[in-house]
C-alpha cells in the first residue's frame, strides 16, 4: 500500500535542553518519514490531546477525528547518564500500542543518529519494510578546476544534513572507489 499515512507526534520536554533535544528528534523523524513519501505529519494545530501520552493511553477517537492513523508519543529527559528517550507508537484505528522503546543517549552528538534509528523503527513497524534512514553515505568530494581537482573522501547521513557531513581525508592524495567494509565500521578505498 503506497497511500500516505497520517502521523501525529507528541513530545514531552522537561526544560530548555530537553526541549531542544526533543525538537531536534521530532524534526528529524518527521522529515525522514515525510520524505519517504509514505507519511505526512498531521498539523499540530489540529491536536485535541497533546499532554504526555508516554504514560497514558491516548484518546484514540480524538486522533481519528484529525485523520492521524498512527501516533508517536515521546518523552525526552536529562539523567546523570545522558538524555533519556521514552517512545511509544500507536495504531490509532486499531486503538493499540504497536511499539515501545526506551533508551539513554550518552552523548548529545548522537541525537541525529538516534532520530534516524527511531525513524527506521517507526517505518519498519508500520510498513513491514526495513527502514533506511540510519544510512551513512561515503563518497569522493571533488572541488577545484578540472586540471587541479582536489578529491577528498567524505561521509554523511542519508539526508545530507550539514551536521552529519565529515571529510575523512585531506585531499593531498587521490581517493577512488570508497566502500564500507562488511562490518560497516571501516571504509576501504584506493589511493
List where the protein language model places each region:
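Single conserved hydrophobic/aromatic residue that forms the stacking wall/gate
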Residues: 1-11
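Short, solvent-exposed, polar/charged sequence segments at loop or secondary-structure edges
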Residues: 16-28, 34-83
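Amphipathic beta-strand/beta-sheet edge segments enriched in Tyr/Trp
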Residues: 54-121
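Residue position within the beta-strands of beta-propeller blades
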Residues: 73, 137-141, 186-190
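Structural motif
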Residues: 82-84, 146-154
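Short loop/turn segments that connect beta-strands within beta-propeller blades
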Residues: 93, 157-161
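Conserved beta-propeller blade repeats
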Residues: 111, 121, 125, 165, ...
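Residue-level detector of Asp-centered blade-edge/turn motifs that repeat once per structural unit
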Residues: 131-133, 182-183
Amino acid at each position: 500500500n503506497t497511500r500516505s499515512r497520517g502521523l501525529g507526534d507528541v513530545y514531552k520536554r522537561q526544560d530548555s535542553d530537553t526541549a531542544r533535544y526533543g525538537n531536534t528528534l521530532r524534526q528529524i523523524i518527521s522529515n525522514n518519514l515525510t520524505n519517504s513519501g509514505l507519511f505526512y505529519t498531521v498539523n499540530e494545530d489540529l491536536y485535541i490531546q497533546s499532554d504526555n501520552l508516554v504514560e497514558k493511553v491516548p484518546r484514540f477517537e480524538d486522533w481519528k477525528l484529525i485523520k492521524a492513523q498512527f501516533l508517536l508519543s515521546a518523552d525526552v529527559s536529562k539523567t546523570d547518564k545522558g538524555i533519556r528517550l521514552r517512545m511509544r507508537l500507536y495504531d490509532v484505528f486499531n486503538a493499540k500500542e504497536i511499539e515501545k522503546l526506551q533508551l539513554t543517549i550518552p552523548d548529545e552528538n548522537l541525537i541525529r543518529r538516534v532520530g534516524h534509528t527511531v525513524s527506521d523503527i517507526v517505518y519498519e513497524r508500520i510498513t513491514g519494510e526495513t527502514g533506511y534512514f540510519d544510512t551513512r553515505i561515503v563518497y569522493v568530494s571533488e572541488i577545484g578546476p578540472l586540471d587541479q581537482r582536489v578529491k577528498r573522501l567524505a561521509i554523511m547521513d542519508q539526508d545530507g544534513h550539514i551536521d552529519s557531513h565529515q571529510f575523512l581525508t585531506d585531499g593531498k592524495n587521490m581517493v577512488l572507489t570508497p566502500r564500507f567494509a562488511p562490518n560497516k565500521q571501516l571504509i576501504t578505498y584506493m589511493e
